[in-house]
Structures are given as C-alpha cells and as structure tokens.
Amino acid sequence: MSDRPTQGLTWGPRRDFYNESGSQKIIRKLKEEPLVPIGCILTIAAFTNAYRAMRRGDHHKVQRMFRARVAAQGFTVLAMVGGGMYYAEDRNKRKELGKLKQQQEAEEKRQKWIRELEARDEEEKALQEMMDKKRKRASERTMRAETGSEGIAAQARAAFKDKANKGEAAGAEKTEAPSQRADNEKKPAGSGFLGGWFGGSSKTPETPAKDTKGKNLDSESSS
C-alpha cells in the first residue's frame, strides 16, 4: 500500500500537487472552483456600488446593493461548500500523499545521513590505515638503524681487538729480537774459545804470526 502512493509521487499527474509553485497552486484552485472567485468579485462590486450610492445620498440603491452584497456572499459560501464536498475525496488523497511525501523526504534525509556516516567511517578507516602504515614504516626504519648501528659498533670493536692483538704481537716480537741478538752474539765467542782448545779455527792463532814478523824484524836489524 505504501508503494503505490510513492509511485504516484514520482509518476502521473499527482506529482503536480507537490512540485507546483504558489502561483500554479492558485491557478489550479481557480480552475477547480471557479464559482468562489466569481462570488467574491460580485460581493466586492455590490459593496463598492453601495458606498457610491451612500455618497450620492441614494438610499434606495444603497439598500439594493447591500442586499446584492449579501446574496453574493451567500453564493460564495455555497460555492465553497459545494466545491469542498465535490473535491473532498481528492483533498483527502492529497493529504495522504502529502504525509507520504513527508515520510519519503524524511527517509531520503535518513538515507543521506547514513551514507554520509558511512563515507566518514570509510575516510576514518583509510586515515587509520595510512597512519598504521606510516607507524610501521617508521618502526622498521628505526629497527634498521639500530641494527646498522649495532653492526657498525661490532665491526669497530672487532677492528679494535684486531689492532690490539697486532700491537701485542708486535711488542712481543720487539722484546724477543734483542734477546735473540744477544744469544747470537754470545754463541760465536764460546765456539771460538772452545775452538782454541780443541784445535778449531779462531782468531787467537793469529798471534804467532805477529811473533814471527817480530822475529824477522829483529833478525834484519841484527844483520
């Protein structure tokens, strides 16, 4: 039952009742009840004629115009009552359609409001997702930076340890080199001493040569 009036609102001549302007509504009323404006015009004409007769002092015409005014007013009232009775069904239908139109407008407003809320919810969800993505990227960047700094620190510590180990090894080599040189210098002296005793080659046997040279010099001088 509710679907039929809504169809009447959008299709057919009944939609004119709700899409018409003020002037169109007046014209429609005049066309539906033409006797009412005619009775109003007759009433106004009788009243103006009575006023003019009163200004001229014609009392008989004044009485006639007042009677005509009463008759015109009665005719207008009858026209209004007759028109109301004739168009009562249409007016009831219009009232029902007006209520249905109000309900339809309220429903459209509610649907529009719901759509706006859904659009806002979608925008909020999209914004929340964007913020979550940004936070996730920022956390990943911080984690990468932390891991990179830790790796650099570990490399620096390893390099420092290597340098320390190399320095210790170099210091040990420097301390060992003088002792080895001293041992090497001591070994030839001992071997020469032993060689003198055991017939080995040494520098001590060179002394007899010096003695022979001295003897030769003495013999030459004596001669």
Swiss-Prot record:
UniProt-annotated location(s): Mitochondrion membrane
Coiled coil: 87-139
Membrane topology: Multi-pass membrane protein
Entry annotated with the keyword Transmembrane helix: yes
HIG1 domain sequence ranges: 7-98
Keywords of this entry: Coiled coil, Membrane, Mitochondrion, Transmembrane, Transmembrane helix
GO BP field: mitochondrial respirasome assembly
Transmembrane segments: 34-53, 66-88
Cellular component annotations (GO), alphabetically ordered: mitochondrial membrane
Keyword Transmembrane helix: yes
Biased composition annotated in UniProt, kind: Basic and acidic residues: 121-132, 159-188, 208-223
InterPro entries, sorted: Hypoxia_induced_domain, RCF1
Positions of the UniProt region annotated as Disordered: 121-223
Assembly information from the UniProt record: Associates with the respiratory chain complex III/complex IV supercomplex.
Role summary: Cytochrome c oxidase subunit which plays a role in assembly of respiratory supercomplexes.
UniProt family annotation: Belongs to the RCF1 family.
Protein name, entry field: Respiratory supercomplex factor 1, mitochondrial
Gene: RCF1
